[in-house]
């Protein structure tokens, strides 16, 4: 059996650029990609916290240390500079791989600084 699981998440990243005429994709600071384990050209989903848009594209490496999150091409209609987004990558895992599975969760602060990391989402309480 295979299960599709959350592999990596950049939580509450800020969009720094929206480039409609760029070829497409989402440029992510290379350091953030490495920290999260997101690969260049990997399929990602982006959830816009500010306007509710949800869309799919692929990641490209942005300049390391730049804090760039650039939503490009047609997706630029769905996010604007300053919007808070959640960027997720998913992967398929076998039952054996799930035994030790842990996602990579990166929590962002203002200016796309990393404020924390985790490998588990806390239990939601009523």
From Swiss-Prot:
Amino acids binding substrate: 57, 73-75
Modified residues (Pyruvic acid (Ser)): 25
Entry GO MF terms: aspartate 1-decarboxylase activity
UniProt cofactor note: Binds 1 pyruvoyl group covalently per subunit.
Annotated EC: 4.1.1.11
Taxonomic superkingdom: Bacteria
Annotated family: Belongs to the PanD family.
Name the UniProt record assigns to this protein: Aspartate 1-decarboxylase
Species annotation: Alcanivorax borkumensis (strain ATCC 700651 / DSM 11573 / NCIMB 13689 / SK2)
UniProt lineage: Bacteria, Pseudomonadati, Pseudomonadota, Gammaproteobacteria, Oceanospirillales
């Amino acid at each position: 059996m295979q299960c599709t699981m959350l592999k990596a998440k950049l939580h509450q990243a800020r969009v720094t650029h929206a480039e409609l005429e760029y070829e497409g994709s989402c440029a992510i600071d290379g350091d953030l990609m490495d920290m999260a384990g997101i690969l260049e050209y990997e399929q990602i989903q982006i959830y816009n916290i500010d306007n509710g848009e949800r869309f799919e594209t692929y990641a490209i490496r942005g300049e390391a240390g730049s804090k760039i999150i650039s939503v490009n091409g047609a997706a630029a209609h769905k996010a604007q500079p300053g919007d808070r987004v959640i960027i997720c990558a998913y992967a398929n895992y076998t039952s054996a791989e799930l035994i030790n599975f842990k996602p990579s969760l990166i929590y962002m602060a203002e200016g796309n600084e990393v404020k924390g990391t985790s490998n588990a989402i806390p239990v939601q309480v009523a």
